Amino acid sequence: MDSEKMDLFSKLPDEVISHILSSLPTKEAASTSVLAKKWRYLFAFVPSLDFNDSDFLHPQEGKREKDGILRSFMDFVDRVLALQGASPIKKFSLNVKTGVDPDRVDRWICNVLQRGVSHLALFMDFEEEYSLPYEISVSKTLVELKTGYGVDLYLWDDDMFLPMLKTLVLESVEFGRGQFQTLLPACPVLEELMLLNMEWKDRNVILSSSSLKNLKITSEDGCLGTLSFDTPNLVFLDYYDYVAEDYPIVNLKNLVEVGINLVLTADRINRARDNVWNLIHGIQNAEIFHISPVTFEVLSLSCEAMPVFKNLTTLNIRTVMQQGWQAMPLLLKNCPNLETLYLGGLLHTVTNKCGDVCDCIPRKKKGRSLMACPVNKIQIQGFRGTIREVHMIKHFLDFCPSLKEMEIIVETKEPTLFEIPKWLEIVEDTLMQYNEMSSCTINYRVLAPLYWRWTRK
């Protein structure tokens, strides 16, 4: 950088320079600060630090084993923290792997905690579990904590208390037995909780919080007995796990959007039939509902228990070819205010219980359920161009009286019939005819590279 440009940067207001330095990775910000004394001075007060050992290491060159590079990284962190002294800090991010000294990591974390850090992101992928320092669990300044990989909370005692914490993200974090039940009461203003790759240590879990608004759970642990949701102000729920033995409490009266992705094995089918309805009834006030293929199958096990989703305006259903649509007729019937329907695939297994939603089996009263459905927009995803799909599209156009818009998105990852020369043109002509015959507007979307490949055949 020439001296003229350097002078221009140096004339910027201090707060602008500080913002620029904060937005850079700390290693780059430190390198930049040697350009001028003013920048070097301001770097000492940068309120955001981001350390990643990959900035120093080059695994593709086989250098991770070189202790000198790891020492260089650790010394760099030490120097930066020493340079900043006791100046306030807002954000601290640390992402390290095996070879970094855990004791030094402890000191770095305690350093920023003492300086009033509010946003903390810690991801340690060590060979052995790393225990987060006790000091984190009693921080009076933390607003956001994100941590994961080889991390546990064994050092956190029953006196944990995080009075300012609003966002907590835990990914593959290990709890001690009974420890999770003390976590939420220790976070009185928590609004967002993400439990990713969760391993439940307790058989019976109660998620209880009056402040929580957003909750995401992903787990394939399969060891949970009962799971309760006592979260009356929850607005968003994304739940992915094996079906629990029971859902005794489901207090979700203010829920707006929910995604249910259940994992089901053969030995849990009866459990799902008997116990999952407490969960489904608990989410009946939602306005947006995302349903995975397995969840859709679970709904078909006991359709008569399905509640009325009186507030539901958007329904997103993903299905697979190996499943039937047994739950579809009653599900649509029980959504009296449905406006938008997303279908992740039209192809499914033909059964005598598909009802009259599809045209799989000829029926005298074909389309009756659709005629009572108020939906005005349908989006079809994963369209493969089969004749059966085209017939299904015509069926929806014929029997959905309120339908104003249909969007068809062509499959991009799996094989389709469009590989057959001229087939895309034939399907497009057919859909164009449907568009002219119907009051519904049909929009057809295909990626440009695929379109050119198929039309050139």
UniProtKB/Swiss-Prot annotation:
InterPro entries: F-box-like_dom_sf (IPR036047), F-box_AtFBL13-like (IPR053781), F-box_dom (IPR001810), FBD (IPR006566), FBL60-like (IPR055294), LRR_dom_sf (IPR032675), LRR_FXL15/At3g58940/PEG3-like (IPR055411). SUPFAM superfamilies: F-box domain, RNI-like. It comes from the Eukaryota. SMART domains: FBD (SM00579). Pfam families: F-box, LRR_At5g56370. This is Putative F-box protein At3g58860. Residues 6-54 form the F-box domain.
